[in-house]
Amino acid sequence: MLDNKLGNRLRVDFSNISKQIEIPNLLQLQKKSFDYFLNLDNGESGIEKVFKSIFPIHDPQNRLSLEYVSSEIGKPKYTIRECMERGLTYSVNLKMKIRLTLHEKDEKTGEKVGVKDIKEQEIYIREIPLMTDRVSFIINGVERVVVNQLHRSPGVIFKEEESSTVANKLVYTAQIIPDRGSWLYFEYDAKDVLYVRINKRRKVPVTMLFRALGYKKQDIIKLFYPIQTIHVKKDKFLTEFNPNDFMDRIEYDIKDEKGKIVHQAGKRLTKKKAEQLIKDGLKWIEYPVEILLNRYLANPIIDKESGEVLFDSLTLLDESKLAKIKEQKSFDIANDLANGVDAAIINSFAQDGETLKLLKQSENIDDENDLAAIRIYKVMRPGEPVVKDAAKAFVNDLFFNPERYDLTKVGRMKMNHKLGLEVPEYVTVLTNEDIIKTAKYLIKVKNGKGHIDDRDHLGNRRIRSIGELLANELHLGLAKMQKAIRDKFTSLNADLDKVMPYDLINPKMITTTIIEFFTGGQLSQFMDQTNPLSEVTHKRRLSALGEGGLVKERAGFEVRDVHATHYGRICPVETPEGQNIGLINTLSTYAKVNELGFVEAPYRKVVNGKVTNEVVYLTATQEEGLFIAPASTKVDAKGNIVEEFVEARQDGETILARREEVQLIDLCSGMVVGVAASLIPFLEHDDANRALMGSNMQRQAVPLLTASAPIVGTGMEQIIARDAWEAVKAKRGGVVEKVDNKSIFILGEDDKGPFIDHYTMEKNLRTNQNTNYIQHPIVKKGDIVKAGQIIADGPSMDQGELAIGKNALIAFMPWNGYNYEDAIVVSERIIREDTFTSVHIYEKEIEARELKDGIEEITKDIPNVKEEDVAHLDESGIAKIGTHIKPGMILVGKVSPKGEVKPTPEERLLRAIFGEKAGHVVNKSLYATASLEGVVVDVKIFTKKGYEKDDRAIKSYDKEKMALEKEHHDRLLMMDREEMLRVCALLSKAPLNSDQKIGDKNYKKGQTADISELEKINRFTLTTLIKAYSKEIQKEYDDLKNHFQNEKKKLKAEHDEKLEILEKDDILPSGVIKLVKVYIATKRKLKVGDKMAGRHGNKGIVSTIVPEVDMPYLPNGKSVDIALNPLGVPSRMNIGQILESHLGLIGLRLGDQIQEIFDRKQKDFLKELRAKMLEICSIPRLASEKEFIKSLSDEELLNYARDWSKGVKFATPVFEGVNIEEFSKLFEMAKIDMDGKTELYDGRTGEKIAERVHVGCMYMLKLHHLVDEKVHARSTGPYSLVTQQPVGGKALFGGQRFGEMEVWALEAYGAAHTLREMLTIKSDDVEGRFSAYKALTKGENVPATGIPETFFVLTNELKSLALDVEIFDKDEDNE
């Protein structure tokens, strides 16, 4: 059993199998990938590779060359927090050392003869975004995540598809897919000709490509066909007897050279009979003439006397040709009837012959290889003039130039594996052999001998993580730069000596490419930060979309489906609903990604039917053909498989295998699903569709005011808390020395002696989803802490476990129709106790700009605003902290200069006498929007360099400075304490050299002083005392003192740097002189209309909040918290919720029993407690917690017991849940009826409800679809410019569209006047709107409506088409 007691809570674990390995760090894929990209210590980091692939760059005349020497990465300038506040990018600068070499050239030959000059220069590439320790990026102050991409692995793939032209015919294709470069498609057409396409251009016969690669006709025939030699003897055609030619049933009699039949047609030639015939001396057999008639010559036939070519190779034999050939002794034919070959290549030759004939005439070239290269050039670049050398170079560049073509290591490995090649892995371009072997294998596939690939098999799809994606972007940027440098080379004529690397390189190109990727790329996403789970799963997401991936509109059903190889690698449950279903996936819990990008799943080895403890990680390709048993296979105590036949998996099929055949067994049952799905208890009893909704909705749960962990968990909660950055974890073990709201100090000891670690906590920060981010300590002074233990909870965490909801007492029963259609009835107690209350923080910002008429000003002095409307603003015009904000209130006052109208001389005179009037400024203040209500919790003010800071900015600067000073002071005190502890530890080990009085005690020479006495004395006494020790001790003391002085200097430097950054002028966009951000915290209580959900996809809307006294109550008087509709369970088939509520109720009842022991507080209540807890822990199969409880001290036991008194916590891992026997034992222990139901009384009448009701405890979540953020109403507001109709959507303060179908509804009711209003004055009759408003304010009747703007839009559209449209009144005389 692994030590999982790093958490601060004990759970009764129901696992069947003890875990062999820890769940790997959930975020290691991204971390590893980025570290590899930026790792400059080893020469093989991703960034180095990219530079080396682009440099050196030479100019066309070989005069100059630019080489890459080395690169160095700087330190980030601002901290993560500052970047988020100031809207900056958390990044580093990259220093590239570039060498420019100027070559001496020989005037006559133009060859390089030596080096004339070498210059080296460092070039800065600014702003390469740096991954934060929480695996995200801060881009322009916003936290983003780069999602991993799941794309087709480079290599070769063979496919079989239905023909689009011929019905019921299969088409066979092969594709060679590089990571970068031209794709190569081989395909058969309807007439069995093998063609090749390059990059989806026009197809050419495959032999054309082979000729362009330099192969002659005979070579190609020999590569693809077995050559059969036919001997001519006495007018008969004889060939050697080869039994392999007669594998299938034989069409003709086999005769020996004398014409005797040795085997009859229509019978199979068995191996035995063939061997017998060879024994009997059969060497030559007759080759039937009728079969010879449709064969082709493999070599040309030459007349021996004249030397003239009678028949060229690939001549089709007919009777007249055979008559002439009989004069030869022997000739060769291409045996296209052999096994695994067909006539495709011969047909291709027939096709390309015509093309080459035409080209010969037009190009006046005889060499067929050159002609073939020209043909390919013409297909790839139609309409361009061509020279044969250029064409050959072009074909060579397409596939054999490392700059243009890259298969990568993965592609090379896949090619070698599939085609049985042995090309070294560093050859990442194609070879001739690759192309030939691919065509050969495709012919094999067509003839039923090869293996067709499955494009959705995880051996053919790989993961590109952040490091690789960034490397690709960097490569694109550098390639652009390379092109620009080559263009600059050509424009350089004179003064080559004066050129510096900086003149040639423009680093901006690289920066813009990278920033574009982070801001606009499809894979760089705004981080989902609703709760820690949503963050972790976002970073583990695998997307098939993005650059070089699929397009969601075109992705078919097969790509989206669950594949057998997903088992243990990709979660089959968690994927979005909607058009992205199946294209966006998540890694399974235990899955890892190897360095080639393939996903691996863990298994335990099985040897001769015995399960070993060796864990191996295998990719989908490695596990092909192996027999794998499920984790639920019965195994005895020694690890032997019990049953003789086991249900095992092989290549995705389930089969019965003997236990000796089984080679692997699943690590555990839960390895199939991902992180979110493994948080659902009793997942095995839920329908997959509902489990999908359950996993997705847990990611939307809002962090509540007080988090509480689920009574029924799965054991996964602490793993997520362990790997999410929200929690604070101890780096090293020790004892808690000091704790307050903002910091924790831990005192420990290592090889060097005592040390003190310092941890800070963040408070009330806003996340991307506007939820509140807050950390609070969960350890007390004096607690012992292990390394890696959670010492402070983040949001949605409770005692180091994920806690995204609340345990609520629920009853499945209808309640006066209020829980119709999944609605939820909630007790008022839940609202009163703030159970489901959450805090949300909104950020509002306003900027003051520099305009052509003057500068905008942030001020309290606003024209035409009442005094009481600005009472809550301070002198600087910004809302004070603590102000209660209501919709429509001013948050920040701002005035903007009006464009001046030239004043008349009189006005100028009056202004000169009475001073400036506020008449030439306009109110442009920031107002609270319609739905914003809350308290101002923070204000940030940024001022541009050269502009004066206002009072508020100065105050906030002073406040921040004070906080920094306090933190520095605390850390200095702790460092002093650490120094004293180390000194005391040193002195307490060594004997004294003379008699001394230390504290209250006298010591003789040779004695050692007590550490407790040493700790009492002050520093000055220490300096004199140290002289009473040996020279060695004095030296060690001096070393310690120096070490701490250096540490203090470092701390001071760090502090000064922080102060310097604080004092720095703020970086603001051009034109902006001041930026103010106001943060408003809103408390959102549970309301009617809020969406709630359980963990099993059981979601609903709160329909009513009922007084506690009216809710149904239990016999003991306790009323139910929530009433759910029982009809929501059977049709949805998520029975897991029923089992969860049973187990939850058991937890509560057992908690009550523990509380009773506490309440009785008898003499030996500790013994009683321990006995009770042991009894509960002995129910699971493994009973792994028993030993742990026995080993606890009384103090520790009390801690765990107090936690359990509120409800005993269970862990039922997925697929290993509580079984029936355990349930019945638990029911008995908790004194609950076996049907799990109870009597209930109606809260309104006090009568007993007729039926017994299922009451239990379920973990309920409040989701971030809050009614306060959805409800929206408008009277008047903005109108669209062209149509003059109200705009749409809440964000724009728009109206509700009254569409076509709504019009039908009013027509159906005959509501003509209402309908006319809807279509005119309430929509787009501009004049009508004004006149209606006037009439209403004056209390008159609304006048008749005018013409809607839409009509004018239509007539203007017609006018633009030169049609004169006029509008006539009906009353006018008809002219």
Swiss-Prot record:
Molecular function terms, GO-annotated: DNA binding; DNA-directed RNA polymerase activity; ribonucleoside binding
Keywords of this entry: DNA-directed RNA polymerase, Nucleotidyltransferase, Transcription, Transferase
Pfam families referenced in this protein's UniProt entry, alphabetically: RNA_pol_Rpb2_1, RNA_pol_Rpb2_2, RNA_pol_Rpb2_3, RNA_pol_Rpb2_45, RNA_pol_Rpb2_6, RNA_pol_Rpb2_7
UniProt keyword Transferase present: yes
GO cellular component, one term: DNA-directed RNA polymerase complex
Catalytic activity: RNA(n) + a ribonucleoside 5'-triphosphate = RNA(n+1) + diphosphate
GO biological process: DNA-templated transcription
E.C. designation(s): 2.7.7.6
Function: DNA-dependent RNA polymerase catalyzes the transcription of DNA into RNA using the four ribonucleoside triphosphates as substrates.
Oligomeric and partner information: The RNAP catalytic core consists of 2 alpha, 1 beta, 1 beta' and 1 omega subunit. When a sigma factor is associated with the core the holoenzyme is formed, which can initiate transcription.
Family: Belongs to the RNA polymerase beta chain family.
Name of this chain's protein: DNA-directed RNA polymerase subunit beta
Organism in which the protein naturally occurs: Campylobacter jejuni subsp. jejuni serotype O:6 (strain 81116 / NCTC 11828)
Gene, per the UniProt record: rpoB
